[in-house]
Each structure stands twice: as C-alpha cells, then as structure tokens.
C-alpha cells in the first residue's frame, strides 16, 4: 500500500464510507488536519461519528462537517465554541458523548492496544457515569469506560517516515 499521496483528497479517495468513525488529531484549533477535514467534507460521506477533543468552530475544523450535516455523533471533551453544533444538539439532530479529556485519550490508547474497556475514577458521580458500570475497588468507586477504535484517523504532520 502506498502511504504517500499527492493530496488529502487522494489519500481519502478509496477509504471513506458512510457510517464510519474517525478520530481527529489536534488540540482545540491547533494542529488540526485542515486539508484532510476539507477532503472528508468533499467526499460527501454521512452518518459519521467524530472522535475529537472539540467540535471546531463555525466554518473551521470539524465545524465544516457539522455545517454539511455529515456528523451524526460527536465523542468529545469540549464542544462549547460551535454555534452549529449547539443548534443541532439542542434540536436533537446530533448525538453527543461527553468524555473527560484524559479519559478520551485513554479510551483511544486502550482501543489501539486491543484493550476493550478499563476502570477510572474520573466521572464517578457525574453525568459522565450515567448508564455505565460502576465497581468498587479497595473502597473506591470506579466507572467502566469502553475503549474507542476509529476506522480512520486524521492527523496533521510536518514530517513522516515513508517506511
């Protein structure tokens, strides 16, 4: 498989499908893969689940995919700066799974390692734990978090190894 492509559009051409889950790198609006997000938008794929620490802003980052209504669910730790996200969520048009930032990173790490779930104290006693298994270890309560595995990961890089 050739891992070097001439454009973001070319890189996504044969791998993007409706209903996929994709993870997006960056933090806030820093280091986000703008070209890949635009290329994903241009594929027209729908019913996507986005894993990202934020929902972008109107017209930028994941905001582009929200404006075209391609995202059906967000798994995120922060969504507060996107008016279109807010509109869709409050209208019941968009699913949201809030996940604390550290837990989000661990869910992706665990998924990449083949670990299906893990327990954490983060979120115990909050809405984050609603509907999730709670167990007690050594007198402390922990919430079980299911790992995340994306179909596609979009990252921004300056330099990569082609091997």
What are these regions (language model features)?
Residues 1-163:
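Conserved alpha/beta enzyme-core scaffold
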């Amino acid at each position: 498989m050739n891992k070097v492509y001439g454009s973001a559009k070319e890189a996504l051409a044969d791998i993007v499908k409706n209903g996929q889950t994709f993870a997006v790198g960056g933090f806030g609006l820093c280091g986000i893969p703008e070209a890949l997000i635009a290329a994903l938008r241009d594929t027209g794929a729908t019913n996507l689940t986005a894993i990202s620490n934020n929902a972008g802003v109107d017209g930028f980052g994941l905001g582009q995919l929200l404006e075209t209504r391609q995202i059906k669910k967000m798994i995120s730790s922060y969504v507060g700066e996107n008016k279109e996200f807010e509109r869709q969520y409050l209208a019941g048009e968009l699913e949201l799974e809030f996940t604390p930032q550290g837990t989000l990173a661990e869910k992706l790490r665990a998924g990449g390692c083949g670990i299906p779930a893990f327990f954490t104290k983060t979120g115990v006693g909050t809405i984050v734990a609603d509907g999730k298994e709670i167990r007690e270890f050594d007198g402390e309560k922990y919430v079980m978090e299911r790992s995340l595995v994306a179909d596609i990961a979009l990252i921004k890089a300056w330099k990569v190894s082609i091997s």
